[in-house]
């Protein structure tokens, strides 16, 4: 089925960002169902989306349903299949924060800068402003640490093995800043734009820098870090703003 993805995309008038999203979602779908498309495999695929947000589920189901219709039109499939993409969002007075499946953040992408920005927030809890000020000299990739200096002092942060390859690729450039614009940092808006484009490309347009930072907090809490330890990692004066995450 993977062989039909590119002809399908060519049959549609899609912006580059949307095309990247469609391609990613369809490859993921084909890898999961293989050559067997039937009610059982589609039900298993739909079940695999249970950990995603409502917006992400609807996007993926819509993309796959369009692909299934295309395969039927091309007589690749003898029967027309369509998954129910009517998803009821659950509402509550207090939004429930849950840990997300972030495997898509590490997959191959054309949006390398946006991907690295997202991973720095997700894995280190950095803000776009902090990322803008990062210099290559702040990183010791051999020791796998980042030394982040601010008016509150120096924070030493451990770089995970999963993050390291992305930083090594970025560090190959001979420049001052990690994200360098003629030896000057880019504007905050540039960082938000890069992040937005990457998130849209993996079907997570509803996420933001703030929600990725919340994922960092939830992941650190799940790893057993205390509220004080997480506050220190984030460079906060007080852990008060983190209390809502620890009362969940």
UniProtKB/Swiss-Prot annotation:
All residue ranges annotated as the Tyr recombinase domain in the record: 92-248
Domain of life, source organism: Bacteria
Keyword set includes Transit peptide: no
GO biological process, one term: DNA transposition
Spans through the membrane: none
Molecular function via GO: DNA binding; tyrosine-based site-specific recombinase activity
Domain Core-binding (CB): 1-72
Entry keyword set: Cytoplasm, DNA integration, DNA recombination, DNA-binding
InterPro entries, A to Z: CB, DNA_brk_join_enz, Integrase-like_cat_sf, Integrase_catalytic, Integrase_recombinase_N, Tyrosine_recombinase_XerD-like
Catalytic residues, chain numbering: 213, 245 (o-(3'-phospho-dna)-tyrosine intermediate)
GO CC terms of this entry: cytoplasm
Family under the similarity heading: Belongs to the 'phage' integrase family. XerD-like subfamily.
Protein name per its UniProtKB record: Tyrosine recombinase XerD-like
